[in-house]
Curated annotation (Swiss-Prot):
Role played: Catalyzes the transfer of the diacylglyceryl group from phosphatidylglycerol to the sulfhydryl group of the N-terminal cysteine of a prolipoprotein, the first step in the formation of mature lipoproteins.
GO molecular function, one term: phosphatidylglycerol-prolipoprotein diacylglyceryl transferase activity
Organism: Synechocystis sp. (strain ATCC 27184 / PCC 6803 / Kazusa)
This protein's encoding gene: lgt
Alphabetical UniProt keywords: Cell inner membrane, Cell membrane, Membrane, Transferase, Transmembrane, Transmembrane helix
Residue numbers binding a 1,2-diacyl-sn-glycero-3-phospho-(1'-sn-glycerol): 142
Name this polypeptide is given: Phosphatidylglycerol--prolipoprotein diacylglyceryl transferase
Family membership: Belongs to the Lgt family.
Length: 283
């Protein structure tokens, strides 16, 4: 794959991983399922280090799948309603692509809030454990865009250019064959943020009095959103509200919220809980 990227042969083999009779396993679904499984195992490992029963994540992952995937789809459909108004059954064809991470974050956050209260867990400590798995899952899931030949950027002739089949090109750009692989940019960016969050997590384990509860969540919001603001500007298929790219507006808002959170934790409210408080579950 690396050789293909840098020798101009970078293109999707198609959306279907394999097919047996009438059953087709699509790469998009396989990658989402893989991200969920890998994320679950990572959460159990990190959660145990923070004093959370790993078995709780077996329940939480069901809550998240039930909440995040439908909300990601509905968020996308809401801003693309003209495409679905006359073919509303296509709303359920999620295997064809068309989900929005910000929608998933909204649904997932609500699910985590309800779950944490139901199980008497610290909401912010739970988020600090979950966010490294979330960003890793995003890095994996972005490759679904590659196999679907979607979510690419403007035409380019860079060595790592991505070939897009004629049928998937925008109508006004059919004469161009190669485009920015924005999915790849975001996947690599997310892996970098994942490395930062993991490093911060283990720094917190070694120096618990120096890490405030909620820090990792705030760093995630800032790190991921900064990359999304940049990458979204390259894409040709952004969800729009008038002249505004929705993902950029939301991402800028999340950067501001994450920055405000860091300021609040470390400058305005220095007596807030840090990681030295090990009682994460109320008995």
């Amino acid at each position: 794959m690396i050789e293909q990227i840098f020798f101009g042969q970078f293109q999707s083999p198609g959306p279907v991983m394999f097919q047996i009779g009438g059953f087709a396993l699509r790469w998009y679904g396989f990658l989402i399922a893989s991200a969920v499984i890998i994320g679950l195992n990572l959460c159990q490992w990190l959660g145990q280090k923070r004093g959370i029963n790993p078995d709780l994540f077996n329940d939480l992952v069901i809550w998240l799948v039930v909440a995040a995937i439908p909300s990601a789809r509905l968020y996308y459909v809401a801003f693309e309603w003209p495409r679905y108004a006359q073919h509303w059954l296509n709303i359920f064809a999620i295997w064809q692509g068309g989900i929005a991470i910000h929608g998933a974050l909204i649904g997932g956050t609500i699910a985590i809030l309800v779950f944490s209260r139901y199980h008497q867990l610290s909401f912010w400590n739970l988020l600090d454990v979950l966010t490294p798995a979330v960003i890793l899952g995003q890095a994996i899931g972005r490759w679904g865009n590659f196999f679907n030949s979607e979510a690419f950027g403007a035409p380019t002739n860079l060595p790592w250019k991505l070939y897009i089949p004629f049928a998937n090109r925008p109508l006004n750009l059919t004469s161009y064959a190669y485009f920015h692989p924005t999915f790849l940019y975001e996947s690599v960016w997310n892996l970098g943020i994942f490395a930062i969050l993991i490093a911060l997590f283990f720094y917190g384990l070694r120096n618990p009095e120096k890490i405030k509860t909620g820090t990792i969540t705030c760093v995630y919001l800032i790190g991921y959103s900064l990359g999304r603001v940049w990458i979204e500007g390259l894409r040709l298929d952004s969800l729009m509200l008038g002249p505004l790219r929705i993902a950029q507006v939301v991402s800028i808002t999340l950067v501001l919220l994450g920055t405000a959170g860091i300021v609040w934790l470390y400058l305005l409210q220095k007596n807030l809980p840090d990681w030295s408080e090990r009682k994460l579950v109320k008995n």
